[in-house]
Amino acid sequence: MNIKKLILPAAAALGGVVIPVLIYMFFNYGKPELIKGWAIPIATDTAFVLGILSFFSRHISLELRAFIIGFSLIDDAFALIILALFYAKTINTLALLISSIIIFILFILNYRQVKQLFYYIIVGLLLCISMVKSGIHDTLCRAIIALFIPVNIKGEFNTSFKKLENLIRPFVNYFILPLFVFMNSGILLEYFAFKGICSNSILALIYGIIFGLSVGKQLGIMLFSYPFVKFKLCNLPSDTSWLKFYSIAILRGIGFTLSLFIGSNV
């Protein structure tokens, strides 16, 4: 693994977590009932970012696409780990220990290059059960399983799967995702009565989330990425200017459904 290529997405993801949290806390400082929602603006909705980028696929190099996916994985991992560590109601130590053992088994399967999906499905189901019993949200479990499933499975199944993926991708990007947003936003319109929306608490919450995502994400990504590139600890993706990199940073502020998901678990 090329460590230099890992540094940039890791630094960008860290900045995309730290600065939004600080901005949210700035607006909600001194409000105990709202400050606990500090994790809401840290998450990026990767599916929507990739959907938007599909319109500009000709202008995105393979290296930049790899950076975006790498950033997304690390960013989502931060969000899920924070959710698991800070928002779990109760922790069952024994179940957590069993989960750790099962994760190690997944690692062994991947390390030994076991390509039969059947084993990953069985072990993954056991991991989901143990993780739910431990008190940690099962979303983290699915992310862990996906991390260990090999991507280089060869044969007829893989070829058919790729064809199906290419067939349904436009339908998912341009129809399913917008419909999903509309149907799952969880926003009650009566909350937008004039008196309610103008209360100090609601405004602080709204400002914290909106500025955390729209300003904090891009600011954090740029502030944490620039020094590493400047001191040659890593490089920008090929055929990528700082302006293009900044445009990607702006898109990382799309945190709709994942932010709602975290908010519902706060």
From Swiss-Prot:
GO terms for cellular component: plasma membrane. GO terms for molecular function: sodium:proton antiporter activity. The keyword Transmembrane helix applies. Pfam families: Na_H_antiport_1. Keywords: Cell inner membrane, Cell membrane, Membrane, Transmembrane, Transmembrane helix. It is a multi-pass membrane protein. One of its GO terms (biological process) is regulation of pH. It is found in: Cell inner membrane. The chain crosses the membrane at residues 7-27, 37-57, 66-86, 91-111, 117-137, 174-194, 202-222, 242-262. It comes from the Bacteria. Belongs to the NhaA Na(+)/H(+) (TC 2.A.33) antiporter family. This is Putative Na(+)/H(+) antiporter NhaA homolog. The gene is nhaA.
